[in-house]
């Protein structure tokens, strides 16, 4: 599209490609929110087992960076807690995320978080009576009894700046 419309500026949220002319990408510092959500998880686990459903492995730096920041947050308040990661290799796959969540819950994880896009890790956490930390949407509406917090984006400051500059 950018090549077809050279006088229009395109910007892709959470992307990684650019043409150096009229197409760029932008991203936030998700590790900051991951660190804070790790603190929340570390303060709320009773059994010191925290489940993390991850969309990608180390081939995508965003995900392991988020896991590391989350782990540092957990460790800062609860050095005895362990984080168990299950990788789906997909950003959005209901079946894989459900199975990964079930595996972690069956291991005894009493706090669940995610870096993937279906609500399954959170809805299953609520069904099992454990806490959850959502991602990319406010899960407090869908899982009001279990949601501790959610890592979500508010792009309004970027959009305002991009439009006016």
Regions found by a protein language model. Name each.
Residues 1-165:
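A residue-level marker of the well-folded mature domains of exported/periplasmic proteins
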């Amino acid at each position: 599209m950018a090549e077809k419309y050279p006088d229009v500026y395109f910007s892709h949220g959470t992307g990684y490609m650019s043409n150096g002319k009229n197409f760029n990408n932008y991203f936030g510092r998700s590790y900051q929110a991951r660190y804070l959500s790790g603190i929340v998880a570390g303060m709320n686990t009773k059994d010191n087992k925290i489940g993390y459903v991850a969309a990608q492995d180390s081939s995508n730096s965003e995900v392991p960076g988020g896991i590391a920041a989350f782990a540092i947050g957990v460790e800062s308040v609860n050095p005895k807690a362990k984080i168990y990661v299950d990788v789906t290799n997909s950003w959005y796959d209901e079946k894989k995320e459900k199975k990964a969540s079930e595996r972690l819950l069956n291991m005894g994880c009493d706090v669940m978080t995610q870096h993937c896009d279906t609500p399954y890790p959170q809805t299953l956490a609520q069904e099992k009576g454990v806490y959850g930390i959502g991602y990319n949407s406010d899960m407090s509406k869908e899982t009001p009894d279990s949601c501790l917090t959610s890592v979500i984006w508010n792009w309004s400051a970027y959009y305002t700046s991009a439009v006016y500059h």
